[in-house]
């Protein structure tokens, strides 16, 4: 997308007939395999997508500039040693589980803002958007990404 390289892997249990979560051992194995595979790659994606937040956090910091995950239904943006970990939260509102809770789960999403700097797309900010009450209200939280390169950047020009 506009020169942005995106790669990812499906949820380990996406093809399973029953909605069971993957075991911690399976998640750790997936992370180990991904670390080994991508550490040897000649070209890395700018954004790496995967379902489970546990696997995302087990990816070596600095391997990918941006890792986007979910599964926990808890929105978060965290910078660790050269990687921005983004949990989009609940873009699907937890499916049927969204109707089985006492408190409604808000829909949420993460909107990423990039700016081209010296021919490279650089993440400048992440908007975490939360929609509640069947679309009757929303809130937005903007997280600015710390780079030595983005000091003095006019945030009105980010896209």
Predicted regions and their residues:
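Conserved beta-sheet core of the metallophosphoesterase superfamily
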Residues: 47, 52-141, 147-151
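His/acidic metal-ligating clusters that form di-metal
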Residues: 2-84, 150-158
